[in-house]
């Protein structure tokens, strides 16, 4: 093989290698042809796929975190929570990636800075938001923090029920909900502090009255 042939082969190999996409662990690929048609079969982790004709879209499918922040739900005492933040962790069934991408509204998905598509990210965010507002109505504002674990479980159950109602429970698995912050409104905290202060003041006065009564009884006994 002469020098020019070797160079041509080397260039060809380099071009072939550069025109490939490897599907990493925790993600699934879907091929998009040069005419933008999406193939319905998934490309699984570990596979290396050529992209000389068309390209390969990659979708993270495992433990995707959706941050649902700055919520202001209404509590059972009709007070508005000043700030409620949580995270929803979900995974996509690898065998459902192509179907969800093709059939669901593109507004349900989100794009990462790296160019990956987070399937159903915006949809899960909305379900989480709705669930948080619904569950918050079961608790008094000042008691939410003490019931954080219970609220997390209840919000997750609401999301799972919503997915089941849309027949998506076999395609999307919500594994966890984490409540990051529950901040009652300032006026509710101030009222609670004022109440505690008033109760403490009342107890102090009761002690003073009881002490004075005992002292009077002692003096009366000495003078008897």
What does each model-identified segment do?
Residues 1-8:
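Bacterial N-terminal signal peptides that target proteins for export
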Residues 9-14:
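Hydrophobic helical h-region of N-terminal Sec-dependent signal peptides
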Residues 21-131:
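Hydrophobic membrane-anchoring helix/hairpin
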Residues 25, 29-30, 88, 146-158, ...:
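Short, well-ordered alpha-helical segments
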Residues 78, 83, 115-188:
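Amphipathic, coiled-coil-like alpha-helical scaffolding segments used for oligomerization/assembly
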Residues 16-19:
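C-terminal motif of bacterial Sec signal peptides marking the signal peptidase cleavage site
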């Amino acid at each position: 093989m002469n020098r020019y042939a070797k160079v041509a082969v080397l260039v060809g190999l380099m071009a072939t290698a550069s025109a490939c996409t490897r599907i990493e662990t925790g993600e699934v690929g879907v091929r998009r042809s040069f005419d933008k048609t999406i193939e319905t079969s998934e490309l699984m982790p570990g596979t290396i796929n050529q992209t000389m004709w068309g390209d390969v879209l990659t979708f993270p499918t495992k433990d995707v975190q959706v941050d649902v922040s700055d919520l202001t739900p209404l509590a059972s005492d009709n007070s508005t929570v000043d700030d409620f933040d949580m995270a929803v962790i979900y995974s996509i069934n690898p065998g459902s990636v192509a179907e969800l991408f093709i059939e669901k509204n593109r507004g349900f998905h989100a794009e990462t800075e790296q160019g990956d598509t987070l399937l159903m990210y915006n949809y899960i965010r909305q379900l989480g938001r709705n669930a948080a507002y619904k569950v918050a109505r079961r608790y008094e504002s000042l008691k939410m923090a003490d019931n954080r674990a219970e609220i997390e479980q209840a919000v997750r159950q609401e999301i799972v029920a919503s997915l089941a109602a849309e027949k998506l429970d076999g395609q999307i698995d919500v594994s966890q909900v984490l409540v990051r912050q529950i901040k009652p409104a300032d006026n509710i905290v101030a009222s609670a502090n004022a109440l505690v202060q008033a109760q403490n003041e009342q107890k102090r006065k009761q002690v003073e009255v009881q002490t004075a009564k005992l002292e009077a009884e002692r003096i009366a006994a000495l003078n008897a």
